[in-house]
Design a protein with these regions (language model features):
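Short hydrophobic alpha-helices and adjacent helix-cap/hinge residues
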Residues: 2-177
Length: 177
């Protein structure tokens, strides 16, 4: 970033994964259309790549890298995916306290510990907490992406009545389900 870019106000697009995810690419492009670089406020992006983080030291390094890349706090942070929020939340306890956060694509429950997140353990009542509980001390708005399972199955049945079996395929990542 140039000196002038660092001095300009900006919104930070913070992704849990990488730019190669098709829907993240589309979402990012839509945001970029609305924040042209010659405007009064810029849109910057950062990709945490949470799926490759394996321990607390790597998480701390990711947090430090984020703060080093953006030493001036953003006006707002848009976070895609609750794993990115869980990894970056400690920054909002300190240097970025009270910075507004918009969290997109969050689950109703999140890992109760960093270790649960990093272990990629399936969430249960015992190892997770409601997202509202995790968020209670932050200036955050959560945009939930509902599942329309019943509606989707009904639509499939209407469009293709000959279909008798459907395979549900997932790689156990919320964003890819």
């Amino acid at each position: 970033l140039s000196v002038s870019a660092k001095e300009k106000e900006y919104i930070l697009f913070l992704s849990s994964v990488n730019a190669e995810e098709a829907w993240i690419h589309g979402f990012r492009n839509e945001l970029q259309k609305r924040f042209p670089y010659e405007g009064n406020i810029e849109l910057h992006e950062y990709f945490l790549a949470v799926p490759v983080l394996t321990n607390a030291e790597e998480v701390k390094q990711a947090q430090d890298n984020l703060l080093q890349t953006f030493p001036t706090p953003p006006k707002v942070v848009i976070i895609v995916g609750d794993p990115g929020w869980l990894v970056s939340a400690p920054i909002f306890d300190g240097p970025w306290k009270n910075i507004p956060v918009i969290l997109c694509y969050s689950r109703g429950r999140v890992p109760s510990t960093l270790q649960t997140l990093l272990a990629k353990t399936p969430l249960t009542e015992a190892n997770s907490i409601p997202i509202e509980e995790f968020n209670k001390n932050y200036n955050i708005t959560v945009l939930k992406q509902p599942y329309y399972i019943k509606e989707t199955l009904t639509l499939i049945k209407q469009l293709q009545p000959e279909v008798n079996r459907i395979a549900f395929i997932s790689d156990n990542r919320y964003i890819s389900t």
